Regions:
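N-proximal low-complexity "stem/linker" segments adjacent to membrane-targeting elements
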Residues: 1-25, 253-254
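Acidic helix N-cap motif at the loop->helix transition within catalytic regions
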Residues: 17-20, 41-50, 90-91
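A conserved acidic beta->alpha catalytic loop
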Residues: 25, 36-46, 82
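Short, structured coil segments at secondary-structure junctions
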Residues: 28, 49-51, 129, 153
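Conserved beta-strand segments of alpha/beta enzyme cores
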Residues: 31, 53, 156-158
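Short acidic donor-binding/metal-coordinating loop in glycosyltransferase active sites
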Residues: 37, 57-59, 75, 82-85, ...
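Glycine-rich, basic loop-to-helix element that forms the pyrophosphate-binding segment
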Residues: 58-73
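Catalytic-site signature of metal-activated, phosphate-bearing donor transferases
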Residues: 67-70, 77, 88-251, 257-258
Length: 258
C-alpha cells in the first residue's frame, strides 16, 4: 500500500529554466518527484535544491517515461505536471478535496495556455483537458503511442474545474521546431491507416482545419493570435498530407533497369 496519498511528478530534459518554479507550485502535494532524462544543464541539482526527489531514466518515449513513474513513485495518486506548467492554489484545493473520497480513478485537468505571451481562450487551446491526475494502481500508458500519450484507465475519469497554467510556445521558432518533431510521427499514423490523399487533399484539409480552429472552436475570440495559430496549424495539416502523398508517389514509381 502506498505510504503517501498524492505526489507530483515532473518529466524533464534540460529544464533548468523552468524546474524550480514548477516544483514550488507543487509544494502542497506529499512530495515531488522529478524523473529526468539525463539532463546536462543542471536541472537535477536545481530540482534537489528546491526539495524534489530526483530519479534518472534515459528517455525512450513519453509513454514509457510516464509508465516508469507509475511503477516507481510511492503514492496512491500521481499528478503529472510538465516543467513549463504550474499548479495553482485553486487546483491544489480542488484536488486535495476530491481524491480523499472519490470513486473516479482519473481526472482530466484543464489548462490555461500562454502562447507567444497571450493567454488563449479558444482556438483549441482551451480548455485543453489533459488526463494527468491518476490513481496509480489503475493507470497505464499505451506504450505504442510515443507522443500524444494515451492512458489506459481501469475505471471512470472526471473533469476538474481549476486549470494548470501552461507557458507554452514563447516564440514562433519554438512552435515550428516542435511541430517538426511531431511531423514524422503524424505522417506515419496516416500511412499506417492506409490514407491515400488526392492531389487536392492537402489544400482542402488546410482550409477545413483553419475553419475548424478559427470558426468552430471560436479562434476569433483570440483575435490576431487566434488567426495566426489557426493559420500555422492549417499549414501543418497541409504539409502532413503533402508528405503522405509524396511518399505514395515515390512508392509507385517503377524501378528502372540499365
Amino acid at each position: 500500500m502506498a505510504t503517501e496519498l498524492l505526489k507530483g511528478v515532473i518529466l524533464t530534459l534540460n529544464e533548468a529554466r523552468h524546474i524550480q518554479a514548477c516544483v514550488e507550485s507543487l509544494a502542497w502535494t506529499d512530495g515531488v518527484v522529478v524523473l529526468d532524462s539525463c539532463s546536462t544543464d543542471g536541472t537535477q541539482d536545481l530540482a534537489r535544491a528546491t526539495g524534489a526527489e530526483v530519479l534518472e531514466h534515459r528517455f525512450e518515449n513519453y509513454a514509457q517515461q510516464r509508465n516508469v513513474a507509475l511503477d516507481t513513485v510511492d503514492a496512491e495518486w500521481i499528478l503529472f505536471v510538465d516543467a513549463d506548467e504550474r499548479a495553482t492554489p485553486a487546483l491544489a484545493a480542488e484536488v486535495r478535496e476530491l481524491i480523499r473520497a472519490c470513486e473516479e480513478t482519473g481526472w482530466w485537468v484543464p489548462r490555461h495556455n500562454h502562447i507567444f505571451g497571450h493567454l488563449m481562450r479558444a482556438t483549441g487551446w482551451y480548455p485543453d483537458y489533459q488526463l494527468r491526475l491518476l490513481r496509480r494502481s489503475a493507470a497505464r500508458y499505451d506504450s505504442t503511442r510515443h507522443v500524444h500519450e494515451v492512458v489506459d484507465l481501469d475505471g471512470e475519469a472526471g473533469y476538474l474545474e481549476s486549470p494548470l497554467i501552461h507557458y507554452n510556445y514563447e516564440t514562433l521558432q519554438q512552435f515550428v521546431d516542435k511541430q517538426r518533431r511531431y511531423l514524422d510521427y503524424d505522417v506515419g499514423i496516416l500511412q499506417a491507416s492506409g490514407t491515400a490523399p488526392h492531389l487536392y487533399t492537402p489544400y482542402t484539409q488546410a482550409v477545413r482545419h483553419f475553419w475548424w480552429r478559427f470558426v468552430t472552436l471560436r479562434g476569433w475570440r483570440d483575435t490576431v493570435w487566434g488567426a495566426l495559430l489557426s493559420t500555422l496549424m492549417a499549414y501543418y495539416e497541409m504539409v502532413k498530407y503533402l508528405r503522405v502523398r509524396q511518399a505514395l508517389r515515390s512508392d509507385r514509381k517503377p524501378e528502372t533497369t540499365s
